[in-house]
Every structure is written in structure tokens, then in C-alpha cells.
């Protein structure tokens, strides 16, 4: 554990890209930080940074070391959490990368329930698109990911999956509100506001539009599902979201309906972690709670037909 502080300095230089900026972030002089890293490199036996005219970046040996640093930090957090369990006091920290749809309702409730039972546990919630969430797991930036339609899944160990049909969101007075299930063609006949291309909802809509021979032509494109939800009340427009990010009680002036899976395939909301990673106790227990909650949500879901 004697190198833990040095590892923090190395991470700071990696993030900042220079000794000077990292020294400012870590409240240490640049000369002292440079000396600390040089001493570590001498002991390690290899240089870990490329010294470039405009800064520093990890070389291949440094990348290997960074993997070790992240693994060691994870192991230490897990042992600390286990030690807290032995004393009868649940402590620890849970970091989770998630899609925007989890922010309004599902995740706040789940965190509050967990913290009510274990107030010593803290949380970090990182809002990520589907590629960024997987990257967070790979770099140990997040313990868990709860993401809609992940891209690669190579190192993504799926813990639980919840089917999520794409829903159209519109003003309460829209003619679309008169139908239980919508066809994509009817939605696209209205002005539409779409999520940006990195998001799983957009990916499924692109598939559906190609299937029926139409192009997606948004009047507004945004990275914010919150903007989509509020904008449709300002204009006779149609937006899109998944059920876990929608509730009937959210606003009186907007409504939503599922789009038929004959047009748009049902997507998957996946809870996962990095393959072969042993999670800290708090994160593992929170994952168990999420599995229970997601399983209950699946039992109440309605087919889209």
C-alpha cells in the first residue's frame, strides 16, 4: 500500500496530460511531483510516460501499470467494505454508469431505499451513453452499468436484462393519445424531436424507419431526454423514450404510448459489470437490489403487439 499516494499522482498526470496541471490539481509543486514520478520509474524499472513537447501521456508500460492501479484500488475498496461488514456497519461506495432514462424515477428510488438501510454507503452516478458506459466499466471508473442497448458487450458481464419498448411522447391533446399502441409511420407524420445518434433509442428508431422505408428527419435533435420530454408540450411534436424513464403522473400536459414492435424492435436495458471483476461488497449488494427491482418491473410490463 506504500505506493497508493504515488498512484494517485500518476493518475492525476494521466488525466491532466502534464506535470504542471496535475501539480496544481494535487496541491503540490511541479518539481516535487516530477521527482516523485521519476523515483517511482527508477524503482519500477521502466518509464511509464512519454514526454512530449505539449505534455505527457502513458506509454504501453504505463497503460499496464494503470490497469494494475485500478485493480488494486478496486480490491482495496472491496476489502474495506468486507471489514465494515465484520463490524456490523455497512459502509462503502457504489459508482454506477447509467442511461438518462434511469435518472428521473428508477435510480433515485433505488439509491434512497439502499441508503435507508445502509446510510454509511455513498454513491456516484455517472450519466453515460451506451458506449461511454462500457468504457467506464473497462477503466474501473464505474462498478456497475445500467444502460439501454449497449454496443459491444465484449467485456460486459450481463447481470440482468429488462425488455423496454420505445415509447412515443407527445402533448396530451395529440390524436396519438387515442390509440393504445402506435405505428411508427403515424409518429413520423408529426414533427419529431430525436435523441442524438449515440443513444440506444435513436438506434432502434433508425432500424424501424429503414424497415418501413422512411428517413428520420428531426426538427430538433438533442442529447437531453429531459428536453425531449418538455419540448413536446411546447409544440405539437413527438419525442421518444423508454418506459423506465416515464410515469403517468409526471405531467398533466404530456402523454405517451408504446410503438408497435412490428415497426421498432424492443430494446434491452442491461445491468452489468466488467467481466471477471470482483465487485466491492456495497456494489454487489446494490446490484442484487437492482435485479429484484428490474425483475418486478418486467412482471408489470405490457406487450406492444
Regions found by a protein language model. Name each.
Residues 91-154, 222:
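Central regulatory/effector-binding core of bacterial HTH transcription factors
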Residues 154-160, 164, 179, 226-276:
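Beta-alpha-beta core module
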Residues 177, 191-212, 279-288, 293-303:
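Secondary-structure junction motif
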Residues 153-192:
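Flexible hinge/capping segments at coil-to-helix
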Residues 129-134, 138-142, 147-148, 198-257:
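Hydrophobic hinge/microswitch elements
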Residues 106, 255-300:
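A late-sequence structural motif
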Residues 15, 41-58, 63:
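A short LG(V/I)-centered, amphipathic sequence patch enriched
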Residues 11-29:
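Short helix-boundary/capping micro-motifs
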Amino acid at each position: 500500500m506504500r505506493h497508493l499516494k504515488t498512484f494517485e499522482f500518476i493518475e492525476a498526470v494521466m488525466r491532466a496530460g502534464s506535470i504542471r496541471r496535475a501539480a496544481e490539481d494535487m496541491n503540490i509543486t511541479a518539481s516535487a511531483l516530477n521527482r516523485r514520478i521519476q523515483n517511482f520509474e527508477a524503482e519500477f524499472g521502466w518509464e511509464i510516460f512519454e514526454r512530449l513537447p505539449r505534455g505527457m501521456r502513458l506509454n504501453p508500460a504505463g497503460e499496464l501499470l494503470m490497469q494494475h492501479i485500478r485493480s488494486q484500488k478496486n480490491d482495496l475498496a472491496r476489502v474495506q467494505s468486507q471489514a465494515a461488514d465484520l463490524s456490523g456497519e455497512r459502509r462503502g461506495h457504489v459508482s454506477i454508469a447509467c442511461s438518462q432514462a434511469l435518472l428521473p424515477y428508477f435510480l433515485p428510488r433505488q439509491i434512497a431505499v439502499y441508503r435507508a438501510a445502509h446510510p454509511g454507503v455513498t454513491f456516484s452516478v455517472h450519466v453515460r451513453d451506451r458506449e461511454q458506459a462500457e468504457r467506464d466499466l473497462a477503466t474501473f471508473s464505474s462498478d456497475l452499468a445500467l444502460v439501454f442497448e449497449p454496443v459491444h458487450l465484449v467485456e460486459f458481464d450481463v447481470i440482468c436484462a429488462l425488455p423496454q419498448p420505445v415509447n412515443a411522447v407527445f402533448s396530451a391533446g395529440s390524436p396519438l393519445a387515442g390509440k393504445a399502441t402506435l405505428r411508427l409511420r403515424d409518429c413520423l407524420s408529426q414533427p419529431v424531436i430525436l435523441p442524438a445518434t449515440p443513444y440506444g433509442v435513436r438506434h432502434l428508431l433508425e432500424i424501424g424507419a429503414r424497415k418501413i422505408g422512411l428517413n428520420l428527419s428531426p426538427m430538433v435533435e438533442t442529447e437531453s431526454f429531459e428536453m425531449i420530454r418538455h419540448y413536446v408540450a411546447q409544440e405539437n411534436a413527438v419525442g421518444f423514450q423508454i418506459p423506465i424513464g416515464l410515469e403517468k403522473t409526471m405531467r398533466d400536459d404530456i402523454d405517451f404510448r408504446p410503438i408497435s414492435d412490428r415497426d421498432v424492435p424492443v430494446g434491452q436495458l442491461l445491468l452489468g459489470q466488467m467481466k471477471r471483476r470482483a465487485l466491492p461488497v456495497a456494489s454487489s449488494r446494490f446490484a442484487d437490489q437492482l435485479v429484484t427491482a428490474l425483475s418486478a418491473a418486467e412482471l408489470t410490463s405490457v406487450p406492444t403487439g
